[in-house]
Design a protein with these regions (language model features):
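Terminal low-complexity tails and localization/encapsulation signals of metabolic enzymes
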Residues: 1-41, 73, 77, 107-113, ...
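Glycine-rich loop-to-alpha-helix module at the N-terminal edge of alpha/beta enzyme cores
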Residues: 34-123
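Residue-level signal for inorganic ion chemistry
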Residues: 35, 71, 172, 204, ...
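Conserved small-residue-rich beta-alpha loop and adjacent elements
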Residues: 117-200
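Short acidic active-site motifs
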Residues: 136, 213-214
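Periplasmic-binding protein-like
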Residues: 166, 226-230
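Hydrophobic/aromatic ligand-binding patch that stacks against planar heteroaromatic rings
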Residues: 166-169, 217, 243
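Active-site donor-binding acidic/aromatic loop of nucleotide-activated sugar
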Residues: 206-209
């Protein structure tokens, strides 16, 4: 009897809840930290990015229309599913060069839980009832911005990714994520978790590929309302900021901090990608 040939995973894109190959048919080789080849990942094109933005926009009304409590439950479910696949994430973190992969997996799961807990507390803690000199009620409430582009950090391919995606979607935004070019397999594994969770298709869209090729198109896309440039390389930051200014995108860059530091998680990372609306209402006689 011949020896069984194991089934190799093909690292595809994640767009609209599905796993398509790049429309260009391109892929690029991914290497382990020791230089050994690991896999081939799909190399997303400009058209793939456009498709991801369309999927994110289509998913926005349903996701933003859910109650904050329900969104928190959905994020908690993601943490539950990651817990069940922790050995896979641990092995992939080790391949990516993590010195303590168990710590990295624990921190990523805990970050989902932390932001899930904030889902139904943002409006109460950061929204306000404003005193005004007149017969009016005046309220300020947070609302999601819309479609958010995210450039994931290169060196923290799991915790860094979760730390950018979780605060963006818990507030009701939908996202188009450029995964770490160097270690994209962890992003693909996270996409597989999201696909089997309660996160609606299109809320998180993950593209693997060449960062320098995709960032300009993400930053300049007119239907992207905000962009998190935390993972943009220094040499691309000025051009990214200029491209984002064309449609007055909200541009956010997380503070420089160790992602394992509790200070790296903050409710202000949620509101950085939200808008605050002030409403006036007459009191009546």
């Amino acid at each position: 009897m011949s020896a069984r040939v194991p089934v190799k995973r093909t690292a595809k894109l994640f767009i609209g809840g599905a796993f398509p190959r790049s429309e260009s048919g391109r892929s690029y080789e991914v290497f382990a930290d020791d230089g050994m080849p690991l896999a081939y990942a799909a190399q997303a094109s400009r058209k793939d990015l456009r498709e991801a933005v369309v999927a994110a926009r289509a998913a926005f009304p349903k996701w933003s229309g859910m109650t904050a409590y329900n969104r928190g439950q959905v994020l908690y479910r993601v943490a539950e599913l990651m817990e069940g696949r922790r050995s896979q994430f641990r092995d992939e973190l080790a391949d990516a060069g993590a010195t303590d992969p168990d710590r990295g997996v624990d921190a990523a799961i805990d970050r989902w839980v932390w932001y899930a807990g904030w889902a139904d507390k943002i409006a109460q803690t950061l929204g306000t009832s404003n005193p005004v000199a007149g017969p009016y009620f005046n309220f300020t409430i947070p609302e999601p911005t819309g479609v958010v582009g995210i450039v994931a950090p290169i060196d923290q391919s799991l915790l860094g990714l979760v730390s950018r995606v979780a605060p963006a979607i818990v507030g009701g935004n939908t996202t188009v994520v450029l995964a770490s070019e160097r270690s994209p397999l962890l992003a693909v594994s996270l996409a597989e978790v999201l696909a089997t969770s309660d996160v609606p298709g299109g809320v998180v869209n993950i593209l693997t590929g060449i960062t320098a090729e995709l960032v300009p198109w993400l930053a300049s896309h007119m239907d992207v309302n905000a962009i998190d440039v935390t993972g943009v390389p220094d040499e691309l930051r000025a051009d990214t900021d200029r491209a984002a200014a064309d449609n007055v995108k909200r541009v956010h860059r997380a503070p420089d901090a160790d992602p394992f530091d509790p200070e790296a998680q903050s409710p202000y990372e949620i509101t950085a990608l939200m808008e605050f609306k002030t409403v006036w209402h007459p009191m009546g006689a």
